[in-house]
Amino acid sequence: MKDKLVKAIAKDGQVRIIGAITTELVNEGVRLHNCAPTAAAALGRMLTAGALMGTTLKSEKDTLTLQIHGGGIAKGVVITSYADGHVKGYIGNPTADIEPNSKGKLDVSGIIGKNGNLLVIRDMGLKEPYIGQVPIYTGEIGEDLAYYYTVSEQTPSAVGLGVLVDKDLSIKSAGGFIIQMMPGADEMLADLISYRLEEIPSITEMISKGMTIEEILEYIFEDMDLKILESIVPEYRCDCSREKVERALASIGQKDLKEIYDEGKEEELKCHFCNKAYVFSHDEVGDILENYYSEK
């Protein structure tokens, strides 16, 4: 099933929905970072959440950064997403892996930890970015995001995120949804949706059966006048470049850069998001020193 993200409404706009299949996207992120199974599930859930949330941005220049740091062996997960549905991200410890939880599922909460915060940073080109922050609720990520929306944005929400890791460590299925009740929505409608969400199979199970994201949402919102508003293809895409990495190297400061130059060695930097290595020769480090720090 090809990746697809859709925006929709139900019950005459009382409910706002963003849903997506993200199997290929998550596969690419997990491949780039060579993740162990539990780390793959954690990174995949965050990538899916980022793709969903990024599409709420108003401008193509805006960015949304999602961070969760709970003190666990995952050492945090960071995602950056954009309005067109493309995302990039990394997990601090890609080898993080522990025994399944009591339900026999990959223990994402166990590697994330619960002693920390979930941050949502929206950079809309203003002087300061908007930063929303809540304590980690469960460490399972979906429930933490629902808690964030309810507490920080006063929008009652249900967030479902799923990643099914196959025996060969590839991603068999991945996807998710954000369902939000709009101001003035019928409380009984919210109760009905909550009941349905408890009764349906997991999103990874539905994707594995070959259901499209539209069919999954039609199944959840049967008899609720679901209307698909738009669809896009989400993807994992890193926009790193030699120029950006050069600026990052220059930003460490003249003193530290001079120390690197004086060692007479080449300097290698890796992109956090895609692991691509950029090598700067001794002469190139000297050029950076001259270009950024020589007195004009």
Curated annotation (Swiss-Prot):
Give the GO biological process terms: protein refolding
* Localization in the cell: Cytoplasm
Q: Give a yes or no for keyword Transferase in this entry.
A: no
Q: Does the keyword section mention Transmembrane helix?
A: no
Q: Taking the first listed entry, what is the main subcellular location of this protein, grouped into a coarse class?
A: cytoplasm
Question: What is known about what this protein does?
Answer: Redox regulated molecular chaperone. Protects both thermally unfolding and oxidatively damaged proteins from irreversible aggregation. Plays an important role in the bacterial defense system toward oxidative stress.
Q: What is this protein called?
A: 33 kDa chaperonin
Tell me what gene encodes this. Answer: hslO
